[in-house]
Structure formats: C-alpha cells, structure tokens
C-alpha cells in the first residue's frame, strides 16, 4: 500500500472505527460530516484516492460499498467461545450487546473459514439445505459474497439468511424452500449489507 496523506489516514481510521463499532462502513455523507467536508463529493474523491493506493476497495453503486482488504472486525477469541445472537434489534449492529443471548463453548477455528458468531435461525426458509428453525448458524464476518454462497444480509433494518446471487446492480436473496419467494434488491435504489457467510450449522 502506498503512503497515505494525513487526511487519508484520518478517513481510513474513521472507516475502521465504523466497522468495529457498527459492523458496516460509513456512507459518503457520514464521512463528510465527520471530517468537516462541505459535500459527500469531497469524501468520494478521497475514497477514490484511497482505492488507488490500495488502502480500500469500493463497490460501485453501493452507498456503503467500502471494504478494507484483510480487515475483519469482531474476530472471536478462541478461549471465550462464540457469542450466540438471537433476534437482532432493528438497525442495531449484529454483535450489539443487546442481541447476544449467551456464549457457546466451541472453538471458532472448528469452522473454515473461522466463525465469528452464531446466529439463531428464525423460520424455515432454508430448510431444504438443512438450516432449520432454532438452529445455530455459524457465521464468518465478511462484507464480500460470491454467487451461490449462503449469506447473512441486512436490508434496511431487517436481517435475513439466504443464498446470494448478483448480476450487475441487481441482487437476489434466494430461499431454499419453494414456499418463499426470492427477495430482489436493486443496489441503485436500496442498500444491502453483507454481514457474513454461513460456515456451518449447529443443532441442539
């Protein structure tokens, strides 16, 4: 990575702080407000400079489409086990304290890639691939997903587990149960945040 200017380093630090505190990156408007820029366009120019220097990667058409290569917030501690996330409060980060029901004594390294938390599954939309109501879904925190992967996604204030498919700016979140219709998202009109990938299932 090329050397950053003091202002670029400040922006990168703010992005990391947002990822750690909230679980997702800031918007251009939030960066502009935090750094005292007159408009989000100024933030956009700084982000493009950071991307050219290899400090971040940007997803076109997504207001929070900022990724820091190699940076994964909220890594679980092997000794502490994994937090079990119950119902996610509207708008709250997945790992917010009020969402954590308990801790499960299982080594995160048991999963590949390693798990960062367990999410309690609600409903039967993924039953055809063996993910059932009440199961604990092991999740690896990442903001990137490839077509066909099972993801934990946030749309607005709702969090859902579905299979990911993307073509250009269109994303489909596909259920593994014919009773559930696909969820279609146009990234130009609506924000979608990948919270993580499914890396395993625990049934108690």
UniProtKB/Swiss-Prot annotation:
The record marks 90-91 as: Cleavage. It is an enzyme of class 3 (hydrolase). GO terms for molecular function: DNA-binding transcription repressor activity; sequence-specific DNA binding; serine-type endopeptidase activity. It catalyses: Hydrolysis of Ala-|-Gly bond in repressor LexA. The active site is at 125 (for autocatalytic cleavage activity), 162 (for autocatalytic cleavage activity). Gene3D superfamilies: Umud Fragment, subunit A, Winged helix-like DNA-binding domain superfamily/Winged helix DNA-binding domain. SUPFAM superfamilies: LexA/Signal peptidase, Winged helix' DNA-binding domain. Keywords: Autocatalytic cleavage, DNA damage, DNA repair, DNA replication, DNA-binding, Hydrolase, Repressor, SOS response, Transcription, Transcription regulation. Its EC number is 3.4.21.88. One of its GO terms (biological process) is proteolysis. InterPro entries: LexA (IPR006200), LexA-like (IPR039418), LexA/Signal_pep-like_sf (IPR036286), LexA_DNA-bd_dom (IPR006199), LexA_repressor (IPR050077), Peptidase_S24_LexA (IPR006197), Peptidase_S24_S26A/B/C (IPR015927), WH-like_DNA-bd_sf (IPR036388). PANTHER family: LEXA REPRESSOR, LEXA REPRESSOR-RELATED. Homodimer. Belongs to the peptidase S24 family. Represses a number of genes involved in the response to DNA damage (SOS response), including recA and lexA. In the presence of single-stranded DNA, RecA interacts with LexA causing an autocatalytic cleavage which disrupts the DNA-binding part of LexA, leading to derepression of the SOS regulon and eventually DNA repair. This is LexA repressor. It comes from Pseudomonas aeruginosa (strain ATCC 15692 / DSM 22644 / CIP 104116 / JCM 14847 / LMG 12228 / 1C / PRS 101 / PAO1).
């Amino acid at each position: 990575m090329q050397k950053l200017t003091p202002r670029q380093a400040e922006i990168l630090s703010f992005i990391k702080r947002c990822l750690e505190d909230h679980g997702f990156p800031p918007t251009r408007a939030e960066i502009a407000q935090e750094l005292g820029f007159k408009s989000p366009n100024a933030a956009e120019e700084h982000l493009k400079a950071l991307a050219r220097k290899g400090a971040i990667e940007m997803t076109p058409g997504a207001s929070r489409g900022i990724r820091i290569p190699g940076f994964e917030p909220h890594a679980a501690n092997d000794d502490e086990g994994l937090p079990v996330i119950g119902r996610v409060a509207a708008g709250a980060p997945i790992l917010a304290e009020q969402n954590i029901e308990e801790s499960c004594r299982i080594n995160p390294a048991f999963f590949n890639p390693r798990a960062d938390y367990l999410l309690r599954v609600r409903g039967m939309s993924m039953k055809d691939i063996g993910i059932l109501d009440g199961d604990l879904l092991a999740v690896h925190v990442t903001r990137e997903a490839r077509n066909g992967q099972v993801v934990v996604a946030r749309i607005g204030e709702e969090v859902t587990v579905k299979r990911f498919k993307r073509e250009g700016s269109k994303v489909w979140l596909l259920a593994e149960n014919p009773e559930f219709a696909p969820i279609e998202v146009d990234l130009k009109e609506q924000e979608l945040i990948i919270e993580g990938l499914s890396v395993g299932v625990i049934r108690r």
